[in-house]
Amino acid sequence: MLKAGVIAVQGDVAEHADAIRRAADRHGEDCTVESIRSAGVVPECDLLLLPGGESTTISRLLAEEGIDEEIEAFAAAGKPLLATCAGLIVASRDAKDDRVSTLDILDVSVDRNAFGRQKDSFEAAIDVEGLDEPFPAVFIRAPLIDEVDAAVETLAAVDDRPVAVRQDNVVGTSFHPELTDDSRIHGLAFFS
């Protein structure tokens, strides 16, 4: 049985856990999901999710709890990791904001909240590499991926701007895939 971990210092933890379970079921995998709030659990996981929230707070809490180094080691070990919205910011090489301590596990730079404020939130059906049908992406104070290293594959774009990327075992999205009933992004990141 696979063990999934959802970093639970902020964000849509329950929604991501549900999406992971649905994706695992769709792919014929048995999977348990554990919420992670302290060090020591990440190394036990087979797959890991770093959700959204507020990136400066997330990066601070990860460091305070000692989870940051465990996430870096997890990614370096080649295990599948999905980072969404603020999780993408924290996973990036450069958040262009000194208040965010990035993990540098995804070789991209991001511009926090580039898609606007809360009132500028939107939904869009986007084409995603590896999915047969468009995905209903929800953008809430979403970051813009503005620099992508050659080792990073762009999986989806909005107005020619990357919003989903993959580098080896790490997938990052600007949007919130957990806020829909569609678990295909979780399936793409973890079970494809």
Curated annotation (Swiss-Prot):
Pathway: Cofactor biosynthesis; pyridoxal 5'-phosphate biosynthesis. L-glutamine binds at G53, E54, S55, R112, I140, R141. Catalyzes the hydrolysis of glutamine to glutamate and ammonia as part of the biosynthesis of pyridoxal 5'-phosphate. The resulting ammonia molecule is channeled to the active site of PdxS. Signal peptide: none annotated. Its EC number is 4.3.3.6, 3.5.1.2. GO terms for cellular component: cytosol; glutaminase complex. SUPFAM superfamilies: Class I glutamine amidotransferase-like. This is Pyridoxal 5'-phosphate synthase subunit PdxT. InterPro entries: Class_I_gatase-like (IPR029062), PdxT/SNO (IPR002161). GO terms for biological process: glutamine catabolic process; pyridoxal phosphate biosynthetic process; pyridoxine metabolic process. It holds the Pfam family SNO. In the presence of PdxS, forms a dodecamer of heterodimers. Only shows activity in the heterodimer. Keywords: Glutamine amidotransferase, Hydrolase, Lyase, Pyridoxal phosphate. PANTHER family: PYRIDOXAL 5'-PHOSPHATE SYNTHASE SUBUNIT SNO, PYRIDOXAL 5'-PHOSPHATE SYNTHASE SUBUNIT SNO1-RELATED. GO terms for molecular function: glutaminase activity; pyridoxal 5'-phosphate synthase (glutamine hydrolysing) activity. It comes from Natronomonas pharaonis (strain ATCC 35678 / DSM 2160 / CIP 103997 / JCM 8858 / NBRC 14720 / NCIMB 2260 / Gabara) (Halobacterium pharaonis).
